Structures are given as structure tokens and as C-alpha cells.
Design a protein with these regions (language model features):
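Short, acidic Ser/Thr/Gly-rich low-complexity loop/linker segments typical of extracellular
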Residues: 10-13, 53-58
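Surface-exposed beta-strand edges and their flanking turn/coil or helix-capping segments
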Residues: 23-24, 33-36, 52-54, 67-70, ...
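Hydrophobic beta-strand residues in large extracellular and virion-surface proteins
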Residues: 19-21, 37-41, 55-57, 63-65, ...
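Acidic (E/D-rich), amphipathic helical modules within compact regulatory domains
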Residues: 5-45
Length: 92
């Protein structure tokens, strides 16, 4: 059963412009890997920029942030890996 409501959670940005959707969130909201999701990201502690893009989750629960969105989010001196993200997932 695909996602029908907004899901908000906090996670850490990993290396390779990815973040992990926890098993609990995937189980509770019955997230499927074949569903296209509208992802909204806010990086805590850098800029208060809001980035929105469409994505699919991989089998292991990771979502890759597009390179265009990453360049808009990050400052040239700051590497964002390890920063905390506020994530909102909603059906597309």
C-alpha cells in the first residue's frame, strides 16, 4: 500500500548526497520503493533553505539528493555530510 499522507522526520545527511529513511518510518507508513515521492529538505545549521524534488527510495531505504539541489543547498566552504536534515515526504 503506497503512502497517502505527509511524513515528517529528522535524519542525518550521509556521504554521497544521500539520507536514510529509518526502518520504523518505512514500516509505520508502509513506504514502497516503487512509489515516486515529493521530498522537502531543510538543512539545520547552515542556511534556512527549502529544497523540493521528486525521488524514489532504494531497496535499503536511502534517497539520493540530486546534484542540482545539493549545489543550491551547500556553501562552497562547507561540506554538508553529517548535518541534520528535516525531511518531509509526501505522495506525488
Amino acid at each position: 500500500m503506497p503512502l497517502y499522507e505527509k511524513v515528517r522526520f529528522t535524519t542525518k545527511l550521509q556521504r554521497g548526497n544521500r539520507f536514510q529513511v529509518s526502518k520504523y518510518v518505512r514500516w509505520k507508513y508502509k513506504l514502497e520503493t516503487n512509489q515516486t515521492l515529493k521530498v522537502t529538505l531543510i538543512v539545520i545549521g547552515v542556511w534556512n533553505t527549502l529544497q523540493v524534488f521528486l525521488a524514489r527510495m532504494s531497496q535499503d531505504g536511502r534517497i539520493v539528493i540530486p546534484k542540482t539541489n545539493m549545489t543550491l543547498m551547500q556553501n562552497r566552504e562547507v561540506e554538508l555530510a553529517g548535518y541534520v536534515l528535516n525531511v518531509t515526504l509526501e505522495p506525488f
